[in-house]
Amino acid sequence: MRDRPHRIPRAPRLEWPGGIVPEWAKPQGGQGARKGRGGKGARGKEAGKRERLQKVMAQSGHGSRRNIEILIAQGHVTVNGHVAKLGDLVGPGDRVKLDGKLISLRFGTQLPRVLLYHKPEGEICTRDDPENRPTVFAKLPKVNNARWVSIGRLDFNTSGLLIFTTSGELANHLMHPRYEVEREYAVRLMGILTPEQVQLLTQEGVEIEGEKCRFDRLVDKGGEGSNHWYHVVLKEGKNREVRRLFEAVGLMEIGRAHV
């Protein structure tokens, strides 16, 4: 009897909450991607790789999808010498420029790279600083045909975990409030919260920039003397929101780390 060929088992199918697959996890070219028009041969393969401009720029690490859409709408992006529009399709043969500078784009099924970095105090989370302070991006390894995008930021005097990725799509998925990704901080205060202050910070909320803000969770972690530790959780982060919430109830933050 002739031996039957060995079959490789299929990988299990991923199940996403609500059946909604995020953009960064969808196939990007290759098997499973939508085929473009153009018939057989090289021309058909080339057409099949054409994708929306803002999506390709985001997955290539040139910013989050929302920021890139703003840049395109404001006329900062050109494709083959013409000002781009939202929804334009591009392929590997197109020349895309951002503010007049040719940028590299990544097509295909390559997965995004992700990097964890413990930010010490005394570093900023932007690429350029008028005061020439140290930046976290100077410490990251170089990547070819892409660049690192920071998933959130920490204050200059705050230490803790930062996540970087080469995919703007993934960064947007983790940062956008509608996905409700939790951010946890360990905060050291000068003083102890009263039950009324805890209720204000977790239920009633404090107005910041015309909007009610509150912690999703607040846990007392104890302490000694006037120094007291709390762990707080937010599902979206405004500029210095943790510090401003505690200042609103009269307590000064003297230390914080992103958990």
Identify the function of each model-found stretch.
Residues 1-29:
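Mixed-charge, low-complexity intrinsically disordered regions
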Residues 19, 26, 34-256:
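Basic, flexible Lys/Arg- and Gly-enriched helix-loop patches that mediate nucleic-acid binding at interfaces
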